[in-house]
Amino acid sequence: MEHSRPYGGRKRMSLGNILGDPFALATISISLLAWFITFISCVIAQVQANKNKGLPDKDNPDGNFPPFAWWAVVYSLFLIVGVVIVVASDAIQTYHVAVTGYLAGGMVLVTSGVNSLVYSKNGAREAAAAGFILLSMVVIVWIFYFGSTPSSTPRAFLDSFALSKDSGAMHNQAMNGYGGTGRPETSNSVQPPQMYTSAQLNGFENPSPVGGASQAPTAPTMPTYGNNTMQPNNKSNDEEVLPPIDYPYQAKAIYSYEANPSDANEISFSKHEILDVSDVSGRWWQARRRGTNEIGIAPSNYLILL
């Protein structure tokens, strides 16, 4: 149900987020249909109950219409509207916990409405109970969807049918949820220490350079003894030798991701792209794109291991 938006941009409602996602479109359509069936049936049942009010019990076996059912109808309407707004605004990752809580409360109300109407012999009340049953089935599916993590297999399978599911859906959650910590240090994020040969370090007691220094320390002028003169080594530094990084894991992108423009360590990738991963510990994985061999870090909740 996620859709794209510019990095750090304001969330805007777009019907394309619903129309482009078969799961969102189907469940919202069914819920609206179930709600209209329930609402119209409750109106008819309420009119019939008011008409039969004051009659003996034998002429009015169903009694008064339960007011509780109206509260369930109104709550269900706000529940559906809330889901539509959250999905259309591409704010699922921001409000999925709140939506799950509201859905759980709605499940209690809807099933209670079924219990108060399903045993009646009145056709309108039975139709209202049928609408509540259909609505409760949609609510159960929504609770499972919104309560699951994006990397879970069922949710990733449902999201894979979306026509346009791009980068911004979980970018802010990934940045805020991680709080800028727990990110692996990569060759792009930290400059490795300089590597020196023994000849370059001749005469130094502590050969360790300052981490991150871009130039080797200048050798001091050494004293002269007789004909033997200690000359500073003006030889250029040997080329930096870094151990090769293995990428033993393969991961598939379940969402597209757009790298933060202010962070050169992140890489962008598209949905369903296969990445080579060097380490799967932590919340950010060092990955390499195939074809371009671009290396950087990627949020683990956008990827699923193969």
UniProtKB/Swiss-Prot annotation:
Organism, as annotated: Metarhizium robertsii (strain ARSEF 23 / ATCC MYA-3075)
Xref: InterPro entries: SH3-like_dom_sf (IPR036028), SH3_domain (IPR001452), Sho1_SH3 (IPR035522)
Residue ranges, compositional bias (Polar residues): 224-235
Entry keyword annotation includes Lyase: no
Keywords: Cell membrane, Membrane, SH3 domain, Stress response, Transmembrane, Transmembrane helix
Name the record gives this protein: High osmolarity signaling protein MOS1
Subunit architecture: Forms homooligomers.
Membrane topology of this protein: Multi-pass membrane protein
Function: Plasma membrane osmosensor that activates the high osmolarity glycerol (HOG) MAPK signaling pathway in response to high osmolarity. Affects fungal virulence.
